[in-house]
């Protein structure tokens, strides 16, 4: 049996994600008692010297209730309007909850693009670090009113976003609170014989198959995005726990080592921060390479045009692209040539680049220090 106390008991920097179904009652109203309980537990950790970052869903669900929409809106502008209406109310309640314990909070609204531009990401990291140094509790949510891809895929879901925050802030632990007890081998709402997994050592295809689909009207009830979040944590050296928010004193009990929910162990190999940024950032396209090029990249060599078979998508110099071989994406990198330039020089030798393009910026397509390979 895994000794959780030894693994996560000493976590110093902790990201806690509160799901929509945890923060809302059945009638759609905010669960103020739950929010107060979270604030109380966080204040205890704060007094113990731990740094806490809160990621809170719920703005769209609140907006749905305030606007009396009745059911989940299909139109993206309506969802975004609901988020805009609900976000202020959400922060007001969090502010009041933490003020009872003498703590200040700060609102931070993010999109996944916040992590793609490295300068923006570094500024974000510095801002959050400064807030933590002043004893402020950062409360992060997705900036739904300006998001299209994220909001279309999930309704107010912050699982992957919270994992990105944990990764970028080099957190020790991510806790995902939801409305079920953890990861099961099948849907417990449909199968009485479903077995709860207490520990996941490795995210295998079998583990991935346990991911479900969105089932909740105001949030996401499935496990697919939570497993995706665990993948991000795995390569970032961050442990992750999925737990039921209805459990009394859940945060304290998790840190005390109780077998609550599902614990995802982390990879012992952790990428450097810059490489982690490359791997986790959104890609603009793909470069398809041959087997020889893939083997060369595994030996820490740069990608040359001779190893390029083709490109997919449209991208510019400096964009992050996927690296693909035999139909499998095995890494990401920062390209030094555009997609149009690569179409012209793919499969060519470096001494042919200038003759083909009329100029040559680099001998390589992707420089070795700008490549992050999946493990």
Curated annotation (Swiss-Prot):
Key words of the record: Amino-acid biosynthesis, ATP-binding, Cytoplasm, Kinase, Nucleotide-binding, Proline biosynthesis, Transferase
Keyword Membrane: no
Residues reported to bind ATP: 17, 178-179
Gene, per the UniProt record: proB
Annotated PUA domain residues: 284-360
GO cellular component terms listed in the entry, alphabetical order: cytosol
SMART domains attached to this UniProt entry: PUA
GO BP field: L-proline biosynthetic process
Family as reported in the entry's similarity comment: Belongs to the glutamate 5-kinase family.
Catalytic activity field: L-glutamate + ATP = L-glutamyl 5-phosphate + ADP
Annotated metabolic or biological route of this protein: Amino-acid biosynthesis; L-proline biosynthesis; L-glutamate 5-semialdehyde from L-glutamate: step 1/2
Residues bound to substrate: 57, 144, 158
Name of the protein this chain belongs to: Glutamate 5-kinase
Function, as annotated: Catalyzes the transfer of a phosphate group to glutamate to form L-glutamate 5-phosphate.
GO MF assignments: ATP binding; glutamate 5-kinase activity; RNA binding
EC number, UniProt record: 2.7.2.11
Location(s) in or outside the cell: Cytoplasm
PANTHER family in the cross-refs: GLUTAMATE 5-KINASE
């Amino acid at each position: 049996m895994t000794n959780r106390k030894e693994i996560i008991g000493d976590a110093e920097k902790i990201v806690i994600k509160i799901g929509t179904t945890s923060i809302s009652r059945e009638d759609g109203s905010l669960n103020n008692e739950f929010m107060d309980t979270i604030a109380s537990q966080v204040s205890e950790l704060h007094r113990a010297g731990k740094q806490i970052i809160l990621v809170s869903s719920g703005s769209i669900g609140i907006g749905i209730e305030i606007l009396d929409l009745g059911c989940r809106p299909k139109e993206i502008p309506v969802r975004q309007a609901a988020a805009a209406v609900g976000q202020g109310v959400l922060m007001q309640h969090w502010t009041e909850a933490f003020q009872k314990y003498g703590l200040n909070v700060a609102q931070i609204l993010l999109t996944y693009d916040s992590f793609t531009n490295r300068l923006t990401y570094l500024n974000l990291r510095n801002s959050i670090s400064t807030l933590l140094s002043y004893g402020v509790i950062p409360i992060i949510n997705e900036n739904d009113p300006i998001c299209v891809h994220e909001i279309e895929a999930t309704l107010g879901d912050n699982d992957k976003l919270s994992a990105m925050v944990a990764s970028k802030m080099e957190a020790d632990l991510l806790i995902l609170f939801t409305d079920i007890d953890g990861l099961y081998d099948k849907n417990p709402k449909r199968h009485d014989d479903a077995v709860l997994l207490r520990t996941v050592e490795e995210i295998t295809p079998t583990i991935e198959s346990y991911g479900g689909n969105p089932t909740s009207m105001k949030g996401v009830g499935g496990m697919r995005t939570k497993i995706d979040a665990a993948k991000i944590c795995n390569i970032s050296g961050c442990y992750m726990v999925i737990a039921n928010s209805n459990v009394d004193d859940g945060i304290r009990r998790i840190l005390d080592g109780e077998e609550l929910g599902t614990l995802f162990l982390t990879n012992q190999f952790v990428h450097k921060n810059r490489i982690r940024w490359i791997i986790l950032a959104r890609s603009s396209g793909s470069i398809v390479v041959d087997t020889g090029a893939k083997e060369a990249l595994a030996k820490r060599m740069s990608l040359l045009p001779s190893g390029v078979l083709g490109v997919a998508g449209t991208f510019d110099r400096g964009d992050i692209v996927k690296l693909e071989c035999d139909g499998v994406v095995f890494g990401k990198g920062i390209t030094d040539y555009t997609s149009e330039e690569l179409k012209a020089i793919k499969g060519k030798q470096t001494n042919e680049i200038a003759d083909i393009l009329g100029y040559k910026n680099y001998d390589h397509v992707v420089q070795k220090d700008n490549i992050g390979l999946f493990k």
